[in-house]
Amino acid sequence: MSRIVFDASAVLAMILKERGGERVEMALDQTSQGVATEMAISSVNWCEVLTKLQRSPASLTPEELAGILSGVEVVPFERSGAELAAQISLQAPFISLGDRACLALAQSRKAAAWTTDKLWAHAKVGVSIEILR
């Protein structure tokens, strides 16, 4: 079974029809067709997506977003995740808190982290990173 943790940028690329978003859409489609893929997003990244969508023409309610991402688990950002994110800041101080929340969740689940942020290519944090564009 493959495991994916989405960064906010990957989800936004799909919703806003930006380059790289088609890969997220394909992963969601495959899961709905029975392909075994475990997908998750940190509650921090969920908040980032909702915040960005409130300010864009593609305004979606939290319920509409949940429907689009029905196969994606929203994982609460708790103490263990915060501690991992803090460790990641020592290895990659240029990565934001939201990005570190994604990487910490991917690390804890032994999953690939999907993002559109090219800066992540420089993050050597022991997580498989897929840069979608």
Describe the predicted segments one by one:
Residues 6-7, 40-43, 94-97, 117-118, ...:
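Histidine- and aromatic-rich ligand-binding microenvironments
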Residues 33-36, 89-93:
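A short glycine/serine-rich beta->alpha loop
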Residues 70-92:
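Acidic catalytic patch
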Residues 1-3, 71-75, 103-133:
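Acidic, PIN/NYN-like endoribonuclease modules and their adjacent C-terminal/linker elements
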Residues 1-40, 53-65:
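Short, well-structured N-terminal submotif of metal-dependent ribonuclease cores
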Residues 8, 49, 96-112:
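Acidic, metal-associated active-site segment
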